[in-house]
Amino acid sequence: MHSSPRPPSLSHPRAGQCIFRKVAPKITHRHAESNNPYMKEAYDDAKEHSYISYLDANNLYGQAMVQPLPITNFEWSEERDVNTLIETFADNETNGCIVKCDLEYPAELHDSHNDYPLAPERKLVTQDMLSPYAANLQHQLGINKDVCEKLVPNLQDKEGYVVDIRNLKFYRDHGLIVKKVHAVITFKQSRWMKSYIDFNTEKRKQAKNDFEKDFFKLMSNSCFGKTMENLRNRVDISFVTSNRTWGKNATKNDRMIERKLASPLYDGHIIYNEDLAAIKQKKKDLLLNQPIYAGMCILDLSKLHMYRFHYDVIKKTYQDKAKLLFTDTDSLCYYY
């Protein structure tokens, strides 16, 4: 922020805090075998050539952080026409918006999008969602059957989906249907992180050892991490000792421990031994001053980069000949 030409605003609509919310790792095919001359003795020239390629997006978050990102002038918009929003903001260098909308995933896209569905969302994963294979694996490994929330790429319709307008344009152009727009936040945006990220990227190129490369990579990624920090997860930890006397005979230290344990902010404790424990308390006051709106857009732009490569490069070049085996946040593995 200090190296930016204009620091971002750290105040925005209170309700907007809740509208802002990674690419989910996913295994699509569990088994594939390549067959080509590079396999040496394993190569079978009687069979058709096939390859497995693992492709990594170098500096994925860095490329997103040099894009135009929200900076100030956050306002609720009354505009609800998605075409107008896309025409106004999707390719706008100085103005942007985030949209909360309902999306329909047409059935005719399911086969072609099954390996890398657009618009992943956080969902409560229940037992009825598991395939027979997954359910059997859960039983064999003794995995807890409690309902849990996960980031899930899926082909279902979305309700109340929050998305950057640039991603929404890509989703629409690739067949998803915007059924309804619920809310829109507009803002001024600029490439306010570009000079800092470019500096780190250039220093990383010039690095002469692994420490320097990792250091300047960390300088960029940790900056992104702070934009996504959930300040509500911060806690106070007190290390305490006790003479184990209570009531009227309690010492000042013991009464302090009693107050912490009885406090509505109490959030658990760890006992290390008979004489030492740690008491965890939630923060009494929180100052929500992290630019989470920037973090949300960085995540969306990172997804967009991966989606563009898959759908607009690999799919267009190889069509059905390229099969996506698995993905990670910044990588794709193909069999073709």
Q: What is the role of each PLM region?
A:
Residues 1-336:
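Conserved acidic
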